[in-house]
């Protein structure tokens, strides 16, 4: 997040260095009013975003900074190396990527734009984060955290073969720390007709603060509710974000009437006693004592906050893009949406899906989508049972995993199994005190 508005700012001279046609024609969105109606299409459940994957991206960004003068700031080699890393991941995942160049302070900057094929080009949902750091450090929380979460969510879209109703576009902004230069350049150079196609922009800036709060932007009621509902499902209270008002990359979008929202875990403001009581952490201490400092390193991340916010980002993107989650013609989805209660420390329960109309055996990459609501997911053992009773372990219990819910997609090599028949999801709670239920699950052939 850039410093507050009273800090010294340079006046940018943004100059295009690449043709904008590829960026502007890559499917910009149809503007909805800030109070747009909630999506009516049945949204597919978002997958769990693996914390280990997000942290692996942070490790790469840390290494890039270490190899390039200790930072990833605008105009420095570390920033371009960061862009190259993210772009390579997206290119390999099937995205159409575009580098948008601009000039600020006599140095070349870059925005990275990534479009996922498909979706309505007149309704574009964007999600983004600034990729640059300040010059004093690696910027792992500010804003490696947001950049890594958005990247891993984009990769999850690819892994799931997700087909949203809206067109999805992801962005990593340059020179945010100099005054939102990259995002302003993008918005200012987007024709009004293309701006009108933007259904919304989601911003993720500093989402792993070491003494975290859980703050939600209140700029658009639909987006705000989407995030609040997600955290309510985790029994995590939220507050409206005020510290970063106008200080991150959602501001240029908001200024031209695009619905915006986002998440934040706090920067230099001090955590109050009331906030420490509901969120944990240390009262009287900044949410991020290393904000804009050299100590904003890998050790400056709260894993729980990063994990929750990464999953919340995916949830919002899946929900607001209103996708059905159904695969291309020729594939098949078989699901069960009937709730099944899971007894506390009791016998295993099952939920059945009848697969019909298939020929031959199941695929070697059978996708098993699971949505289990539970207050301590480490208690759960989850198996897929083939029609002949063969069990495929999807998830083991883990006493140290205290997070809520199992929302994930697993891949099973079921090529030895006949496709048609009754498949079952089996779930057992092996420890006491926590409860839950199977919300829904599906097989994708």
UniProtKB/Swiss-Prot annotation:
Residues excised as propeptide: 330-445
Site note Transition state stabilizer applies to 291
- Activity regulation comment: Calcium activates the enzyme, inhibited by 1,10-phenanthroline, EDTA and EGTA. End-product inhibited by L-amino acids. Non-competitively inhibited by NaF and NaH(2)PO(4).
Q: Name one GO biological process term.
A: proteolysis
Annotated effect of mutating residue 176 to A:
KM halves (0.33 mM), kcat reduces by 5 orders of magnitude
Record-annotated P/Homo B domain positions: 325-445
Q: Where does Zn(2+) 2 bind?
A: 142, 177, 292
Q: Which reaction(s) does the protein catalyse, per the Swiss-Prot or TrEMBL entry?
A: Release of an N-terminal amino acid with a preference for large hydrophobic amino-terminus residues
Enzyme Commission number(s) = 3.4.11.24
The cysteines joined by S-S bonds are: 290-295
Instruction: State the UniProt keywords alphabetically.
Output: Aminopeptidase, Calcium, Disulfide bond, Hydrolase, Metal-binding, Protease, Secreted, Signal, Zinc, Zymogen
| Cofactor binding: number and manner | Binds 1 Ca(2+) per subunit. Binds 2 Zn(2+) ions per subunit. Can be replaced by Mn(2+) or Co(2+) which results in altered specificities.
Active site per the UniProt annotation: 176 (proton acceptor)
Listed cofactors: Ca(2+); Zn(2+); Mn(2+); Co(2+)
Entry's localization field? Secreted
Pfam families per the UniProt record, alphabetical: P_proprotein, Peptidase_M28
**Which residues are listed for Ca(2+) binding in this entry?**
48-49, 307, 311
Binding residues for Zn(2+) 1: 130, 142, 205
Q: What is the effect of changing residue 291 to A/F/S?
A: Activity decreases about 100-fold
One Gene Ontology molecular-function label: metalloexopeptidase activity
Q: Which residues form the signal peptide?
A: 1-45
Function, as annotated, reads: An exopeptidase specific for larger hydrophobic amino acids (especially leucine), no cleavage occurs if the next residue is proline.
The further comment given in this record reads: Most experiments use protein purified from a commercial source rather than protein that has been overexpressed.
Family, as annotated: Belongs to the peptidase M28 family. M28A subfamily.
Kindly state the subunit structure of this protein.
Monomer.
Q: Which protein, by its recorded name, is this?
A: Aminopeptidase S
Could you tell me which species this protein originates from? Streptomyces griseus subsp. griseus (strain JCM 4626 / CBS 651.72 / NBRC 13350 / KCC S-0626 / ISP 5235)
């Amino acid at each position: 997040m850039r410093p507050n508005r009273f800090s010294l700012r340079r006046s940018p001279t943004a100059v295009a260095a690449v043709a904008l046609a590829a960026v502007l024609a890559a499917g910009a969105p149809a503007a909805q009013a800030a109070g747009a109606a909630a999506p009516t299409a049945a949204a597919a459940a978002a997958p769990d975003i693996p914390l280990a994957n997000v942290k692996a991206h942070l490790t790469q960004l840390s290494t890039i900074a270490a190899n390039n003068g200790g930072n990833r700031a605008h105009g420095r080699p570390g920033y371009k190396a960061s862009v190259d890393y993210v772009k390579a991941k997206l290119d390999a995942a099937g995205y159409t990527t575009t580098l948008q160049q601009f000039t600020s302070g006599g140095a070349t900057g870059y925005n990275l734009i990534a479009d996922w094929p498909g979706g309505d080009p007149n309704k574009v949902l964007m999600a983004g984060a600034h990729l640059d750091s300040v010059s004093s450090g690696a910027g792992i929380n500010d804003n490696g955290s947001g950049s890594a979460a958005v990247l891993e969510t984009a990769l999850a879209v690819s892994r799931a073969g997700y087909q949203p109703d809206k067109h999805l576009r992801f962005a990593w902004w340059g020179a945010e720390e100099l005054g939102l230069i990259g995002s302003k350049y993008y918005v200012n150079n987007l024709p009004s007709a293309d701006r009108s196609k933007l259904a919304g922009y989601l911003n993720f800036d500093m989402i792993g603060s070491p003494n975290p709060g859980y703050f939600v932007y209140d700029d658009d009621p639909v987006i705000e509710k989407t995030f609040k509902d997600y955290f309510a499902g985790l029994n995590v209270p939220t507050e409206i974000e005020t510290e970063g008002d106008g200080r991150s990359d959602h501001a240029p979008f908001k200024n031209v009437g695009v619905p915006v929202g986002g998440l934040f875990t706090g920067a230099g403001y001090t955590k109050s006693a009331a906030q420490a009581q509901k969120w944990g952490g240390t009262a009287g201490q900044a949410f991020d004592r290393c904000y804009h400092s050299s100590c904003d390193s890998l050790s400056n991340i709260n894993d729980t906050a990063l994990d929750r916010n990464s999953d919340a980002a995916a949830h919002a993107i899946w929900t607001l893009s209103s996708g059905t989650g159904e695969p291309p013609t020729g594939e098949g989805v078989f699901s069960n949406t009937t709730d099944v209660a899971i007894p506390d420390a009791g016998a295993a329960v099952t939920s059945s899906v009848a697969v019909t109309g298939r020929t031959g055996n199941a695929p070697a990459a059978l996708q098993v989508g699971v949505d289990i609501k539970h207050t301590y997911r480490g208690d759960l053992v989850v198996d897929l049972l083939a029609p002949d009773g063969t069990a495929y372990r999807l998830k083991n219990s883990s006493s140290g995993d205290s997070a809520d819910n199992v929302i994930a997609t697993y891949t099973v090599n079921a090529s030895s199994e006949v496709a048609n028949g009754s498949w079952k999801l089996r779930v057992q709670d092996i420890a006491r005190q926590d409860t839950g239920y199977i919300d829904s699950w599906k097989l994708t052939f």
